């Protein structure tokens, strides 16, 4: 029955009630509108059946638990009784043992009690100490909190009251206002009006005051208004650094002013100021070298770390065979001397070849390199440097590559300027000298005179106790040439010259040029190792694989050992004379090194140009305009280009400057012609010619093109062109002198001087000076010149004439009239 009731009874009873109402509202147009609103209330009624079932189930569980507890209690009681009986039987046996153990246990308990007491006291002390510290911390915190909260306590309480009970406070205040208003209602109207006005005003004032107080308290809570206090956490302060931070500055080989300033954390203007103090004018983007940057950084108190940027270059050049055995090598001999003292003739006699006759103007224009083998198998390599002063740089390079210098001095000419230069170069290179006194076959030859003149330049012969060998020779007849070769070999034995023969080759570029058919050609003197066909060569800014090698006779060779000069083909461009040539293992790395060198060269060149521009700007500001002669130089070999450019730059004066706008090796091209047109330059070709396209441009643009094969002519013509650009000079030449013998008055011309021409010729149109007691008192011109009644243009010496001086009537007897003309004086450099 109960199960049926459970099944039929609903779990919960829900009754829904609806309430409808009408709400009237006003629309935007001002009309009233009624809206029906229905409110539904939902009520739930629960039955008690489920609760009754739950109570019944709970009673059953409690009865079962009680029954189990009673059973357990009975079992425990039985067990305890059994143990008690057992203990009663064992008690007599145990009593003796217990009496002994009791005394021991009592001792232990006493000891334990003492330890426990000590431990308790220690804990008590620690606890008291901790409590004391905690109490102090609490008091300190409380003190800080009180100090902190003293300013904000009242405002925070008021603000919290304002937030929590603002409604009640407002109601109470409104009630107070109403009571104040009702106090004066029973009085007369006037008094009421007066008092009411006052009360009304007072109530308004008090209300406003209360509102403003509440607002001030609220603002003070959040740090606003005049009473508000800003929190310390919201304030931000910046302390200026007390001193400049000094740091390590890493400087590469070149660096711009802006980059240096950035690394030192200073303004670029500081660096510019510092460099101005050091005498350097720079701009913010100017590239400066490592040494200058180091000086500036150290001056500003920074530690400088210099960085070498060519690690790749060092790695490539360092990867070489260094353990190879050294062997004796042939000496490299440079022949130096003055122009036409017989250097090439002597060398050609040694080589048994007549090359000197073909030299233009008797000057060796290129460095020649030859090696000759002696009868006993020994070998000597000769370098022939040009003798002209313009080839100083070439001769200096020759001295660097050489072991022994043979100084050729003509016995009939003695020591000349280039002879002295050659001595200086030899000393600078540290190369020992052997003097060959040439042309001893001439009747005017004087060997003792040469020795005496060289003695003045610290070249002391063995005869005078020195170490320099003097060998008299005749290049024309061959006298003494064998003695000269023996002297060279003797000197080389003293020097003990050795070199690695089998390793990777290295050497120096003696000369280079661009061949129209073969491309870049470089003459290289191998200094160590063996240069082979197919080797990869790094040579200054250029690199390449050796495609072909030729000796000085034009014969193909496959390899060249130490002290052997060879012509090399296969480089990427024309290297500069004097560059080191090195064989490397990897062509790709050689290319990278060459490109790196080109980039660094451009940077350094740019830095130099910018510096020159600034220096020129400041010099031009002080000097004014300077005439410039623009020149484009093209020559057949690099050494000639360098020598000509240097000679032209040395021709510059304060009034006329030679500006080399372009230079290069090879023929004159269309590019050179267009550059000459743009820069208004003259083109100078030294042993080269213009091609067809260049000639067309030169003719069309009427460019000044000049060819030379002798450097003297080139320099003389450039000097003549520069002389034409000089500002002319003028001087006054006296051409006639007349003495005043009498003075006449003329109605038209005023005072007319009757004169006798004592010197030269008096001309009508020339300027004159009037001298009295040899002092110039007037300078002007003639108005009239007459002989008797005729106007004449000139009157010669010893003749009389009448002279009328324009705008001057104070002529007296005894005065002298000096006639002169202004003559232009031709200037030259």
UniProtKB/Swiss-Prot annotation:
Region called G1, residue ranges: 337-344
Gene3D superfamilies attached to this UniProt entry: P-loop containing nucleotide triphosphate hydrolases (3.40.50.300), Translation factors (2.40.30.10), Translation initiation factor IF- 2, domain 3 (3.40.50.10050)
Record keywords, A-Z: Cytoplasm, GTP-binding, Initiation factor, Nucleotide-binding, Protein biosynthesis
Biased composition range(s): Acidic residues: 147-160
One term under GO cellular component: cytosol
Start and end residues of each stretch annotated as G5: 474-476
Location of the region described as G4 in the Swiss-Prot/TrEMBL record: 438-441
Compositionally biased residues, Low complexity: 21-30
Disordered: annotated segments: 1-44, 79-233
Domain of life: Bacteria
Function: One of the essential components for the initiation of protein synthesis. Protects formylmethionyl-tRNA from spontaneous hydrolysis and promotes its binding to the 30S ribosomal subunits. Also involved in the hydrolysis of GTP during the formation of the 70S ribosomal complex.
Family of the protein in this entry: Belongs to the TRAFAC class translation factor GTPase superfamily. Classic translation factor GTPase family. IF-2 subfamily.
Name of the protein in its database record: Translation initiation factor IF-2
Name of the gene: infB
């Amino acid at each position: 029955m109960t199960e049926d009731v459970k099944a039929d009874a609903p779990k919960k009873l829900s009754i829904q009630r609806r309430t409808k109402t009408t709400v009237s509202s006003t629309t935007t147009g001002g009309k009233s509108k009624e809206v029906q609103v229905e409110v539904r209330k939902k009520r739930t009624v629960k039955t008690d059946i489920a609760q009754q079932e739950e109570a019944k189930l709970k009673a059953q569980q409690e009865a079962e638990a009680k029954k189990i507890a009673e059973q357990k209690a009975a079992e425990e009681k039985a067990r305890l009784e059994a143990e008690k009986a057992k203990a009663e039987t064992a008690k007599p046996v145990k009593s003796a043992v217990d009496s002994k153990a009791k005394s021991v246990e009592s001792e232990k308990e006493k000891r334990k009690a003492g330890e426990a007491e000590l431990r308790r006291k220690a804990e008590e002390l620690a606890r008291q100490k901790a409590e004391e510290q905690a109490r102090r911390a609490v008091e300190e915190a409380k003190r800080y909190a009180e100090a902190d909260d003293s300013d904000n306590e009242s405002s925070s309480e008021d603000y919290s009251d304002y937030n929590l009970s603002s409604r009640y406070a407002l109601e109470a205040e409104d009630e107070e206002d109403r009571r104040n208003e009702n106090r004066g209602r029973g009085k007369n109207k006037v008094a009421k009006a007066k008092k009411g006005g006052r009360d009304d005003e007072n109530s308004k004032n008090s209300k406003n005051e209360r509102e403003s107080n509440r607002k001030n308290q609220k603002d003070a809570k959040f740090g606003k208004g005049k009473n508000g206090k800003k929190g310390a956490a919201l304030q931000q302060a910046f302390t200026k650094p007390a001193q400049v931070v000094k740091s390590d500055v890493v400087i590469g080989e070149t660096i711009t002013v802006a980059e240096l300033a950035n690394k030192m954390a200073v303004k670029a203007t500081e660096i510019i100021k510092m460099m101005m103090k050091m005498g350097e004018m720079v701009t913010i983007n100017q590239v400066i070298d490592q040494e200058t940057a180091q000086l500036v950084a150290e001056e500003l108190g920074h530690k400088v770390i210099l960085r070498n940027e060519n690690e790749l270059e060092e790695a490539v050049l360092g990867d070489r065979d260094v353990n190879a055995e050294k062997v004796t090598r042939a000496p490299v001999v440079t022949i130096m001397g003055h122009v036409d003292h017989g250097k090439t003739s002597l060398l050609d006699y040694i080589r048994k070849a007549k090359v000197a006759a073909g030299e233009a103007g008797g000057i060796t224009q290129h460095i020649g390199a030859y090696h000759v083998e002696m009868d006993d198998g020994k070998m000597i390599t000769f370098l022939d440097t040009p003798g002209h002063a313009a080839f100083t740089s070439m001769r200096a390079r020759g001295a660097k590559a050489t072991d022994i210098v043979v100084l050729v001095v003509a016995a009939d000419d003695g020591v000349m300027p280039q002879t002295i230069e050659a001595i200086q170069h030899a000393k600078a290179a540290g190369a020992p000298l052997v003097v060959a006194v040439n042309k001893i076959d001439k009747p005017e030859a004087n060997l003792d005179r040469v020795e005496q003149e060289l003695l003045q330049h610290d070249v002391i012969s063995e005869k005078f106790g020195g170490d320099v060998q003097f060998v008299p020779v005749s290049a024309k007849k061959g006298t003494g040439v064998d003695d000269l070769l023996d002297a060279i070999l003797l000197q080389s034995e003293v020097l003990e010259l050795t070199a690695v023969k089998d390793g990777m080759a290295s050497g120096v570029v003696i000369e280079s040029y661009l061949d129209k058919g073969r491309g870049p050609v470089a003459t290289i003197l191998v200094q160590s190792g063996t240069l082979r066909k197919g080797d990869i060569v790094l040579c200054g800014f250029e690199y390449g694989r050796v495609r072909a090698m030729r000796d000085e006779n034009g014969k193909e060779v496959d390899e060249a050992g130490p002290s052997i000069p060879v012509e090399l083909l296969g480089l990427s461009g024309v290297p500069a004379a004097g560059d080191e040539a090195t064989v490397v293992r990897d062509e790709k790395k050689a290319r990278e090194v060459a490109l790196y060198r080109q980039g660094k060269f451009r940077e350094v060149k740019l830095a130099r140009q910018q510096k020159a521009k600034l220096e020129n700007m400041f010099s031009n500001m002080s000097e004014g305009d300077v005439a410039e002669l623009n020149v484009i130089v093209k020559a057949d070999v690099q050494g000639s280009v360098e020598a000509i450019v240097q000679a032209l730059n040395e021709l510059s004066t304060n009034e006329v400057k030679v500006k080399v706008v372009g230079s290069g090796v090879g023929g004159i091209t269309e590019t050179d012609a267009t550059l000459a047109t743009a820069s208004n330059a003259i083109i100078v070709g030294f042993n080269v010619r213009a091609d067809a396209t260049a000639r067309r441009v030169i003719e069309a643009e009427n460019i000044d093109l000049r060819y030379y094969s002798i450097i003297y002519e080139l320099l003389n013509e450039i000097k003549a062109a520069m002389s034409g650009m000089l500002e002319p000079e003028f001087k006054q030449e006296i051409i006639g002198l007349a003495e005043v013998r009498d003075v006449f008055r003329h109605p038209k011309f005023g005072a007319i001087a009757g004169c006798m021409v004592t010197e030269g010729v008096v001309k009508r149109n020339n300027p004159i000076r009037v001298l009295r007691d040899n002092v110039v008192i007037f300078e002007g011109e003639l108005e009239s010149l007459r002989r008797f009644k005729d106007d004449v243009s000139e009157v010669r010496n010893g003749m009389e004439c009448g002279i009328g001086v324009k705008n001057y009537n104070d002529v007296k007897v005894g005065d002298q009239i000096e006639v002169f003309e202004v003559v232009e004086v031709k200037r030259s450099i």
